[in-house]
């Protein structure tokens, strides 16, 4: 019987099989998701050379209290005995594993709110944010730090060093040839923390909003804006402009829906770089949003979906169709100051809103949402129709504005300036400009 050697065939087949496995292993290293948010919530802080667990969102005062390192700051005269907290540096640390973000082409470390003066380090080296510095100095801005390519395999070490705000403010004040009545104005920080007639002085620091990695491959979809260009009794016309950042020429399907009904569906060819898309929707016989006491505060669910291969990116905002106008007409005694909603003048019955907690990170999570809802429900039940957010506090959390939308409460939003002379140098103004841009974009889709 003639014998045939199968070994060479097996060897060739095995080599092909090995190449096949290695090739697809390399390809599969790339994460199949468009976008992923990875929370960084397990942090520690150092006090007297010892590490303690920290809560994020949080602040140093609540972290000290939760670890029983201080007593209740609101009891008796403890406000005076706890002023040392705001006068020293505090260090927060965490670690993350490189495997958490492997497979993503783009990764940024994001602080949605960090209070206030801090330096950021990765593995002992300064981590630069998109403006080319590792220092942050505004609690009302989002700060983004692109991660470098040379991360360590395994554990990587993040460190946030908080610098005392009063020390910075005194140093800035000493540069002036005159004395200011308030030094707090040099920091873009909640003014009320420096003490007010209604509350104590607790100059705190910390990560008062979430901290996370923003990871993406191929495309990144930006927030859409709701632009109402026409509204009458028969129809409404809205545009939903947004941007998509693309690594290459790509095809995506863009769908825009209102309350689950599709009003726009197009296949779009993206170019490499930034792409502006502007879906337009026409809604027949829209129900209008009215302030409390005038009618129903009708809200629609506006949704944009971007389909890219098997991935779907989805973004939602609730919106009320309405017109709001401030009418100022010259008369015999000056100028009128009249709000007109959906063509009808409205008598404003308002309330002044100050922060609901001395430590504002306490308004995060379920407990904070419940408190927002209860306080705003009291405003609605008192027949009020407008809430003014005082400029000595903060730009509020998203839950606050959502409940105002639902309850028919107009919001008069101050920029955060109050009862002080503020610097006018170019650096300060540029910082405030970025703050204003970020907050306007964040809040613009509330009716």
Model-predicted segments: where are they?
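Secreted/periplasmic carbohydrate-active enzymes, especially glycoside hydrolases
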Residues: 1-11, 15-19, 29-387
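Short, glycine/acidic-rich beta->alpha junctions
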Residues: 137-143, 392-396, 431-435
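Substrate-binding/active-site clefts of carbohydrate-active enzymes
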Residues: 339, 347, 351-357, 415-428, ...
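Acidic (Asp/Glu)-rich catalytic clusters
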Residues: 344, 403-407, 440-447
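Aromatic-lined substrate-binding rim segments of carbohydrate-active enzymes
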Residues: 375-382, 386-430
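An active-site-proximal structural segment forming one wall of the substrate-binding cleft
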Residues: 428-446
């Amino acid at each position: 019987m003639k014998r045939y050697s199968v070994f060479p065939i097996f060897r060739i087949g095995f080599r092909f099989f090995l190449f096949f496995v290695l090739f697809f292993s390399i390809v599969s290293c790339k994460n199949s998701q468009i976008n992923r948010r990875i929370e960084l919530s397990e942090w520690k802080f150092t006090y007297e050379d010892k590490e303690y667990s920290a809560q994020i969102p949080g602040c140093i005062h609540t972290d000290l209290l939760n670890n029983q390192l201080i007593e209740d700051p609101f009891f008796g005269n403890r406000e005076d005995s706890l002023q040392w907290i705001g006068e020293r540096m505090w260090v927060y640390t965490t670690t993350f594993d490189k495997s958490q973000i492997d497979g993503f082409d783009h990764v940024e470390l994001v602080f949605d709110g960090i209070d206030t003066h801090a330096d950021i380090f990765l593995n002992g080296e300064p981590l630069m944010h998109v403006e080319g510095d590792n220092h942050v100095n505004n609690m009302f801005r989002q700060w983004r730090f692109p991660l470098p390519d040379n991360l360590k395999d395994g554990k990587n070490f993040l460190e946030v060093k908080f610098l005392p705000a009063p020390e910075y403010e005194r140093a800035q004040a000493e540069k002036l040839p005159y004395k200011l009545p308030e030094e707090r104005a040099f920091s873009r920080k909640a003014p009320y923390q420096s003490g007010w007639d209604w509350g104590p002085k607790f100059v705190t620091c910390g990560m008062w909003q979430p901290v996370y990695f923003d990871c993406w491959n191929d495309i990144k979809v930006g927030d859409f804006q709701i632009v109402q260009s026409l509204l009458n009794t028969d129809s409404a016309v809205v545009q939903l402009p947004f941007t998509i950042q693309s690594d290459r020429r790509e095809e995506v399907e863009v769908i825009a829906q209102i309350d689950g009904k599709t009003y726009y569906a197009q296949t779009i060819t993206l170019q490499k770089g930034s792409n502006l898309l502007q879906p337009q929707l026409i809604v027949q016989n829209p129900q209008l949003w009215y302030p409390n006491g005038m009618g129903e505060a009708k809200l629609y669910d506006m949704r944009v979906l971007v389909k890219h291969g098997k991935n779907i990116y989805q973004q939602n905002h609730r919106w009320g169709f309405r017109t709001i106008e401030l009418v100022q007409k010259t008369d015999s005694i000056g100028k009128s100051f009249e709000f007109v909603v959906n063509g009808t003048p409205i008598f404003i019955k308002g309330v002044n809103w100050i922060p609901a907690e001395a430590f504002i990170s306490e308004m995060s999570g379920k407990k904070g949402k419940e408190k927002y809802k209860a306080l705003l429900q009291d405003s609605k039940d008192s027949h009020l129709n407008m809430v003014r957010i005082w400029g000595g506090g903060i730009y509020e959390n998203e839950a606050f504005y959502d409940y105002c939308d639902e309850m028919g409460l107009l919001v008069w939003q101050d920029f955060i300036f109050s009862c002080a002379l503020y610097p006018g140098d170019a650096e300060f103004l540029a910082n405030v400009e970025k703050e204003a841009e970020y907050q306007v974009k964040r809040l613009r889709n509330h009716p």
